Amino acid sequence: MPLWLILPLSLALILPLGENATAALKEIPLPEPRLSGSMSLEEAIATRRSVRSFRKAPLELHELSQLLWAAQGITQGQAGFRAAPSAGATYPLEFYIAAGSVNDLPPGLYKHKAQGHELTELAKGDFRSALHDAALRQRCVKDAPVVIIIAAAYERTMARYGERGIRYVNMEAGHSAQNVCLQAVSLRLGSVVVGAFNDESVKRALSLPQNENPLYLIPIGRP
């Protein structure tokens, strides 16, 4: 067969694969987040502690939904503004979920989509053990029914603010992580922020894109 026929054919076999892989990803709608709770903000701030021991009890899907809404939920629909401030509304953060024990959600790796407030299933299986190894074998990472991973694509903010954008991204990650921790308290859940991990090991375990860097692991469960 002539080369000019072979080349387009080989490209046709390769290119649709990525498109089909993306199209095949399962989208899971999350329950609508509530805008009022039984605990005041002041009480949540006063009660928050780092919790590293969790009972063997699953989370509910509506609880995970609420936690992710607190992290980066859209709070102003028309403009798309979110629960945590972002420099120039550049939104450099991505939120991944290593789910091990969540009712109505199979174990797997998921990514939160703020638009539409839904999860994209990236892979099936329990990723907590791999994260546990990457996080210097901290037991809370393995024992928590769910681990939220905050990753950052720094270039989204640096494209607008240059080197100063690095600081803005790190600030935003802190805002989001604190929102998650306070929301966990409001739900009578325990959480702890983990920064002691090998970045490359986390990236490999979750197959993160090359331009994304993990900043936080947040194990969450019932104390």
Regions found by a protein language model. Give the residues of each.
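Conserved hydrophobic/aromatic beta-strand scaffold that supports enzyme active sites
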Residues: L109-K111, V147-I149, L217-P219
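Solvent-exposed coil/turn segments that connect beta secondary-structure elements
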Residues: Q72, G100-V102, A114-Q115, A151-E155, ...
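A glycine-rich helix N-cap at a beta->alpha junction
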Residues: S207-P223
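Small-aliphatic-rich amphipathic alpha-helix that forms the alpha element of a beta-alpha
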Residues: R48, L67, F95, V146-T157, ...
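Short linear sequence motif anchored by a di-proline
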Residues: G18-A21, V202-A205
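Bacterial N-terminal signal peptides
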Residues: W4-P16
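N-terminal amphipathic, basic helical "cap/leader" segment at the start of enzyme domains
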Residues: N20-A144
